[in-house]
Amino acid sequence: MRVLGIETSCDETGIAVYDDKKGLLSHALYSQVKLHADYGGVVPELASRDHVRKIVPLIRQALADAGMTIEDIDGIAYTKGPGLIGALLVGACVGRALAFSWDKPAIGVHHMEGHLLAPMLEDDVPEFPFLALLVSGGHSMIVGVEGIGRYTVLGESVDDAAGEAFDKTAKLMGLDYPGGPRLSKLAAKGVPNSYRFPRPMTDKPGLNMSFSGLKTFAANTIAAEPKDEQTRANIACAFEEAVVDTLAIKCKRALKQTGYKNLVIAGGVSANTRLRSSLAEMMQGLGGKVYYPRGEFCTDNGAMIAYAGLQRLKAGQVEGLEVKGQPRWPLDTLEPVD
């Protein structure tokens, strides 16, 4: 089965073709980073308009790269939510229209399920069950995964997501958009343990997380300390250490609670080098293994949507004729794939 995947939940237009026998055949991606840089963040209306401009050319490109036409496609998967409603509707409208006009089945995919399953695009894949840490600009959650669609959200951020805290702290430091990767680059120049930031909610039972207070602590530290480059790097390093340690502590607690031996990390923040290194070291000590997608599949992309959609289409799950986007969509409400 060959599935065309369409991702338009935020500020990346991602298109891919995935074959259940041959794997990923093609993927094309357009990022709107330059468009939103002048505003210091994503402007929803501009994001929607840019998706409209880019989506059809990217579909043509992905099909051409795969050596196919739409007639060779067996199904279409598009991101249904969560995300920006205008952006979601662009992908949903195009995906549903193509499916209707070419008489193909279509499925709306949960964006975070796409991230969760992104490591399945690699050669070395995790076996169910496993623990998943999903960390991005909009979400931070720890999920018990028994199978596709069999998810239990064990813990999540009660305020800012980890990626959001990275971006906001970067902005406080005067770093350009996108701030998270720039803050991490600055942190690499810092001296570890120069400052001690709190590890929020790690002294309390449970698996929920909080990062808004950490952002406030960073703001106060930035205001009180010298503004030279090394001090800025040390502060960035301390902030990153605190976020990574908090995530690692919560994951270790969840692994002990569930008895799972393998950990998946996915979402934009999963590309963070310090986070990967810390969790790999932790899992080695626990006798388990950590899995994550390659860098280009950590951020939003069509490949993960094509893969996730294929699993559901093969199970006979299809959308009706309605075009619908879900800005909010709890992950643990998804229908299981038997």
UniProtKB/Swiss-Prot annotation:
It catalyses: L-threonylcarbamoyladenylate + adenosine(37) in tRNA = N(6)-L-threonylcarbamoyladenosine(37) in tRNA + AMP + H(+). Fe cation binds at H111, H115, D300. Transmembrane segments: none annotated. It comes from Shewanella pealeana (strain ATCC 700345 / ANG-SQ1). PANTHER family: TRNA N6-ADENOSINE THREONYLCARBAMOYLTRANSFERASE, TRNA N6-ADENOSINE THREONYLCARBAMOYLTRANSFERASE, MITOCHONDRIAL. This is tRNA N6-adenosine threonylcarbamoyltransferase. Belongs to the KAE1 / TsaD family. Required for the formation of a threonylcarbamoyl group on adenosine at position 37 (t(6)A37) in tRNAs that read codons beginning with adenine. Is involved in the transfer of the threonylcarbamoyl moiety of threonylcarbamoyl-AMP (TC-AMP) to the N6 group of A37, together with TsaE and TsaB. TsaD likely plays a direct catalytic role in this reaction.
